[in-house]
Amino acid sequence: LSKRAPVAVVSLLVAVLAGCGDTGDGTSSGTGGGGRTLTVFAAASLTETFTSLGKTFEGAHPGVKVRFNFGGSSALARQITQGAPVDVFAAASPATMKTVVDAGDAAGAPRVFTKNRLVIAVPKDDPGKVGGVRDLSRPGLKIVLCAEQVPCGAAAKKALDAAGVRVRPVSREQDVKAVLTKVRLGEADAGLVYRTDARAAAPQVRGIEFAEAATAVNGYPIAEVAKAPQAALAKEFIGLVLGGQGRTVLTQAGFEAP
């Protein structure tokens, strides 16, 4: 009996230790024992800035993961009104946010936190020799624009109309990043994108300012989504975006004050 006792004690200790290390409840050590996920839908043009702010938010909230869905604002708004579980929505135009508000899917009034304007994006070698907005109507030039139903497309139409320039794009894309990609890859001679996107893609892409862009500056509203799964975290994230840290990150990226 005395010889078996130590073996029994060791076996018991192993069992206890194994039980302590069990993560069968679905909680891993990386989530801080009860991790939560904040889901943010945001316009594609916010990819770089919101990714940075997301890391800041996670650093201040151990155990919290910020999950982003970046894309065309109109498509994101449609997903929200169709019931997607989302905590925060940041759109690239008040008109797009209005569709969410009108559907009763915004908790409280949205707040415009920044503004953005268009530039002409050209590849770094500028094969089309584009010098300004009037060059966009030149025959043979491959121009790419956003679809008119998304904020960057609506802004492009307004700016081009103000310039009196008629453009026949070779394609219309669902978000500004898709336009930027075609320009960067040399599949287009030029495209209209937000200033911040052209700056983020430098030096592969160069942005050309034009005066008429001032007629189509887009305001970016942000709101907590109604029935947000993480309502308290949503409010805190919005506070970060609206606060000093958010303003610094946005300004450094080329966004304008609201």
Regions found by a protein language model. Give the residues of each.
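Bacterial N-terminal signal peptides that target proteins for export
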Residues: 1-9
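Exported/periplasmic ABC-transporter solute-binding proteins
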Residues: 4, 17-59, 65, 74, ...
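Bacterial N-terminal signal peptides
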Residues: 8-18
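A short, gly/pro- and small-residue-rich
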Residues: 103-110
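Short, glycine-/small- and polar/acidic-enriched structural segments
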Residues: 110-118
